[in-house]
Curated annotation (Swiss-Prot):
Keyword Transmembrane helix set for record: no
Family in the record: Belongs to the ScpA family.
Biological role stated in the UniProt entry: Participates in chromosomal partition during cell division. May act via the formation of a condensin-like complex containing Smc and ScpB that pull DNA away from mid-cell into both cell halves.
Swiss-Prot/TrEMBL GO biological process terms: cell division; chromosome segregation; DNA replication
Main subcellular localisation: cytoplasm
Residue ranges crossing the lipid bilayer per the database entry: none
Keyword hit for Cytoplasm: yes
UniProt gene name: scpA
Top-rank lineage group of the source organism: Bacteria
Localization per record: Cytoplasm
The protein's name: Segregation and condensation protein A
GO cellular component, one term: cytoplasm
Keyword annotations of the record: Cell cycle, Cell division, Chromosome partition, Cytoplasm
Subunit structure of this chain's protein: Component of a cohesin-like complex composed of ScpA, ScpB and the Smc homodimer, in which ScpA and ScpB bind to the head domain of Smc. The presence of the three proteins is required for the association of the complex with DNA.
Natural source organism: Bacillus cereus (strain ATCC 10987 / NRS 248)
């Protein structure tokens, strides 16, 4: 099975790091590099397993994190001072911390500008202009509160749960299901369930190939705005609703 899925909601490695900092309530001024590196690499590994189009920037950041981690493990000596004569030891995390703080400010400003734009749009009665032809790139983004990083975390949890339950002697029979067919199956399943269902209940089959196809089908349905993903709080169960049900 080969299915490359590129989604603009992946804004870059700094966005993923901020997501991890928020998700695990990490102090941005005192980042536990070992833990954040492990989580980051886990996400990147899952993205590659799902054959998502992982930009090279993610791999560069992975190398940077590993380098910082190795520096943090080195013994500190009094002679390890900065070239400018300062009498303190340079923190290997300093540059990354500054980049994250700047990026966080940028994200906040961008969010505020978007909210103001939406407020202004509500003040006008003029029919909206069709910019469809100019929005080819924007069509791949996911206009949802639940991010793709949340979805990846849920998929990781699901894979761990399935692996724990699976008997060692189970024989895997390879099956290939088209993404489009699985999308149709999910929509029918939601209709039977009254328009809303737990994300985990979509994965009734333990075969890895089918689980991957199901996850990619969910992403495609999200992109097409045929389903909505809901999560009350961080780490809560994720629910999938048909778009008509949530409207």
């Amino acid at each position: 099975m080969q299915y490359n899925f590129k989604v603009e909601a992946f804004e870059g490695p700094l966005d993923l790091l901020l997501h991890l900092i928020h998700r695990y309530e990490i102090d941005i001024y005192n980042i536990p590099v070992a833990e954040i590196t492990e989580q980051y690499l886990s996400y990147v590994h899952t993205m590659k397993e799902l054959q998502l189009d992982v930009a090279s920037e993610y791999l560069v950041m992975a190398a940077t994190l590993l380098q910082i981690k190795s520096k943090m493990l080195l013994p500190k000596h009094e002679e390890d001072v900065l070239d400018n004569g300062d009498d303190f030891i340079d923190d290997p995390r300093q540059e990354l911390m500054e980049r994250l703080i700047e990026y966080k400010k940028y994200k906040q400003v961008a969010t505020e500008l978007k909210e103001r734009e939406q407020e202004r749009a509500q003040l006008y009665t003029r029919p909206p202009i069709d910019f469809t032809s100019l929005q080819q790139e924007e069509e791949t983004s996911l206009p949802l509160d639940v991010t793709l990083y949340d979805m990846l975390a849920a998929f990781q949890k699901l894979m761990r749960r399935k692996k724990a339950k699976k008997p060692v002697t189970t024989r895997i029979t390879r099956q290939e299901i088209p993404i489009e067919q699985r999308m149709t199956d999910i929509l029918k399943q939601l209709e039977i369930q009254g328009g809303r269902q737990s994300f985990y209940d979509l994965f009734v089959d333990d075969e890895r190939e089918i689980m991957v196809v199901t996850f990619l089908a969910v992403l495609e349905l999200m992109k097409n705005q045929q389903i909505v993903i809901e999560q009350e709080h961080n780490f809560d169960e994720i629910f999938v609703s048909s778009y008509t049900k949530s409207a």
